Curated annotation (Swiss-Prot):
The gene is celC. One of its GO terms (biological process) is cellulose catabolic process. Its EC number is 3.2.1.4. Disulfide bonds join C39-C133, C183-C214, C193-C208. Residues 38-136 form the CBM2 domain. Pfam families: CBM_10 (PF02013), CBM_2 (PF00553), Cellulase (PF00150). This is Endoglucanase C. It catalyses: Endohydrolysis of (1->4)-beta-D-glucosidic linkages in cellulose, lichenin and cereal beta-D-glucans. Belongs to the glycosyl hydrolase 5 (cellulase A) family. It comes from Cellvibrio japonicus (strain Ueda107).
Length: 747
């Protein structure tokens, strides 16, 4: 067989780093409705140390409520953040309406949500007080169904009919919407714009739709009036309990219907988030709420996330028997054709999804290349593939679509990452039209340089013999194509698009302008998606055809160098012109197994100050992982955006916990032989602690173990030095990484 060398995800001289996520368990939790009728306190999720909850206010009178204020108090529980209301006090708490949700028509419901900690106690259900909490009737909870009702709307749900991945509450007001000043956009409520005359706008810190655009929809959609009428929702038409009440326009349930005061729901009509809904088939509303947290259909979306790669292309060795120096696009699956006397390991993608879900995963980042979208590209088809025939794809495009659909069936959310301009150029690109020389051009003893490939049609050096021309127009076309997959495949799990991986070669001004165009392109096709924006680097313009004219980029302290994709230092003062509830910042950050940064140097070795990478190795510099120093850099580079209310989802973090020992390259073992402690594991622990404390979500790189500088969550017998012939084989989960991730997620 042709031996396949592991694709090094990045040359160790590349500048990258990453983070982690504070996850929320999805256990189905019964709620308690106390307080006077008209107000409900609903526990929507709970885990060991915390919970999420909502307060729902139903107007059960015959008069319009203009403005509301409610209060509640705990014994030991405390609120840590709140969205869609103004919060005051500190146990007791008070919450009042925002400008857009203060008016409640008779028979209608509004809600706001919050997250809290139990402080070693149990999850409480306190009484809610306020003038709006009078009149009507309260709800009841049975042993196998969860139903709430008010005097103005009624619902009937049979036992065992609630199956939801995000909430345990189904309210009878699911078919009632707030009327006036809103647009029912194909089943989803948005505010009507005041000053925007056509298309979509952004006013009062929220997305809105112009009256002319809203009115152009076919019936029954359009501008929502003040009247109400009964509606009947058929079996399997309501997607999860997020449809149980009217939610904010920017995060409303896609299963809301224009207006009603009563509804009938059959025994199978409340289903998981992967089911169909009244909205456009295959779509789900993904938003970032005012607290910077991810939501789906108005409910908090747990983001226990990992990377699963391969479809973006790998690097084959120059002596491969079938595909020398090729770049096949094939998801790693732990089942290579030559294993077990060519019978394969038996592992399937479904098996891996099942195992990942059992470990807590709710979300996956899926890297691709532009060529992945081409079903006819030979690098996505046999005979250039290595997976066992039992799981082998027909082509890379089909594999992409099949993976998305299978993840949807497993209630795993997906976001697609355009990982490079070319499956051959790979991680090196840094820009759409990247040209060599690349960062690994002079790497000693390395078989996988790609100096003969360029993504630019012009101004290439003499080393280039193969051009995969890529530019902004092709990129925007790819974004539109990906945005259309939700409708094409009939799925509701495509969160958004990570528009380009590690754009380290742009200045912030350049990258900001590009992502604004990316937003417009995506939004034209799919207004339900998020736009996921990575950071830049500390320098720009090295891959633009002028490698000697690198431009320094502001990133805060020069002693704290950002990795590729980490630098969002300028984003707070000069953010992209993208609605805040559609924008998700996604920096990358890594420890020493990927690149030894200057901030890792032992301050006791003054001769090592400012050194990094190979220079630090040659000087035999010691590595000291100081969380205080690391956090200063993270705060400058992206952490401060959390306090500004932006959503942050770290796109990549992770590493080889045994570096520079087991599983490391021979070059790293030689260069860093004086390092005998678990410095990369220490770095990962510091990162996980920081992100958990900040409430920042993150995606671990990677689930599969074929990344040469990080390995994976899955263990492998492969070792590039002692067991190179075991490449592509998986065993169980690395218990150290399991503990790291479970601690970070609160599991």
């Amino acid at each position: 067989m042709g031996h396949v060398t592991s694709p090094s995800k990045r040359y160790p001289a590349s500048f990258k780093r990453a983070g982690s996520i504070l996850g929320v368990s999805i256990a189905l939790a019964a709620f308690s409705n106390v307080a006077a009728a008209g107000c409900e306190y609903v526990v929507t999720n709970s885990w060991g140390s915390g919970f999420t909850a909502a307060i729902r206010i139903t107007n059960s009178t015959s008069s319009v409520i203009n403005g509301w204020n409610v209060s509640w108090q705990y014994n030991s529980n405390r609120v840590t953040n709140l969205w869609n209301a103004n919060l005051s006090g500190s146990n007791p708490y008070s919450a009042s309406n925002l400008s857009w949700n203060g008016t409640i028509q008779p028979g209608q419901t509004v809600e706001f949500g919050f997250q809290g900690v139990t402080n070693s106690g149990t999850v409480e259900s306190p009484t809610v007080n306020g003038a709006a909490c009078t009149g009507g009737t309260s709800s009841s909870v049975s042993s196998s169904s969860v139903v709430s009702s008010s005097s103005s709307s009624r619902s009937s749900v049979s036992s065992s009919s609630v199956v939801s991945s995000s909430s345990s509450v189904v309210s009878s007001s699911s078919s009632s919407v707030v009327s006036g000043g809103q647009c029912n956009w194909y089943g989803t409520l948005y505010p009507l714009c005041v000053s925007t005359t056509s298309g979509w706008g952004y006013e009062n810190n929220r997305s809105c739709i112009s009256p002319s655009t809203c009115s152009a929809q076919p019936a029954p959609y359009g501008i929502v009036g003040g009247s109400s009428s009964p509606s009947s929702i058929s079996s399997s038409s309501v997607r999860s309990s997020s449809s149980s009440s009217v939610v904010p326009p920017s995060s409303s349930s896609s299963s809301s219907v224009p207006s009603s005061s009563s509804s009938s729901v059959s025994s199978s009509s409340v289903v998981s988030s992967s089911s169909s809904s009244v909205s456009v088939p295959g779509t789900g509303v993904f938003r970032v709420n005012t607290q910077g947290n991810l939501t789906k259909d108005g409910q908090l979306l747990p983001a226990r996330c990992g990377n699963w790669f391969g479809l973006e292309g790998r690097h084959e060795p120059s002596n491969d028997a079938d595909n020398p120096s090729g770049a096949p696009m094939e998801l790693y699956a732990g089942n290579m054709w030559w294993v077990n006397n060519s019978q394969g390991s038996g592992r399937t993608i479904q098996q891996t999804m099942t195992e990942l879900k059992q470990q807590g995963i709710t979300m996956l980042r899926l890297p691709i290349a532009p060529q992945t979208l081409d079903a006819n590209d030979p690098q996505g088809r046999s005979p250039n593939l290595k997976n066992h025939q039992s799981i082998r794809q027909s082509n890379a495009r089909q594999a992409l679509e099949d993976f998305i659909k299978l993840a949807d069936q497993n209630d795993i959310q997906i976001f697609i990452d355009i990982h490079s301009c070319s499956n051959y150029v790979g991680w090196r690109a840094g820009r759409l039209d990247a040209r060599p020389p690349y960062v690994d051009a002079n790497r000693v003893g390395y078989d996988f340089t790609r100096e003969e490939y360029s993504c630019s049609a012009t101004n290439n050096p003499s080393s280039v013999t193969r051009i995969h021309a890529y530019d902004k127009q092709k990129w925007l076309a790819n974004l539109r194509e990906i945005a259309g997959l939700s409708a094409k495949l009939g799925v509701s799990n495509l969160i958004g698009i990570d528009v380009f991986n590690e754009p380290y070669d742009y200045t912030w001004a350049e990258w900001k302008g590009m992502v604004e165009e990316a937003y417009q392109a995506i939004n034209e096709v799919n207004p339900n998606m998020l736009i996921i924006v990575e950071g830049i680097s500390a320098n720009a313009n090295t891959q633009d055809g002028t490698p000697d004219t690198s431009v320094p980029v502001p990133h805060g302290s020069t002693d704290l160098n950002p990795n590729w994709g980490e630098n969002l230092y300028e984003a707070g003062a000069n953010p992209p012109n993208i609605p805040k509830d559609r924008l998700l910042f996604s920096p990358h950050t890594y420890g020493p197994s990927v690149f030894v940064q200057r901030q890792f140097m032992d301050p006791a070795q003054t001769e090592c100050a400012g050194l990094e990478g190979d220079e630090a190795a040659q000087a035999r510099c010691r590595i000291v992982i100081n969380p205080t120093v690391l956090e200063q850099g993270w705060e400058e580079h992206f952490g401060y955006l959390r306090e500004l209310g932006y959503g942050i989802l770290i796109g990549e973090f992770g590493g080889n916990m045994d570096w520079p020992g087991a599983k490391s390259s021979q070059a790293d073992r030689n260069a860093w032989s004086h390092i005998t402690t678990n410095v990369d594991q220490q770095w990962q622990q510091a990162a996980a602690s920081y992100f958990k404390r900040k409430g920042i979500n993150a995606c671990y790189w990677s689930m599969n173990p074929e990344s040469a500088d990080t390995m994976g969550w899955y263990l492998t017998p492969w070792d590039p030095v002692t067991a190179n012939d075991m490449w592509g084989q998986w065993t169980g989960f690395d218990p150290r990484k399991t503990q790291l991730l479970h601690n970070m997620w609160g599991l």
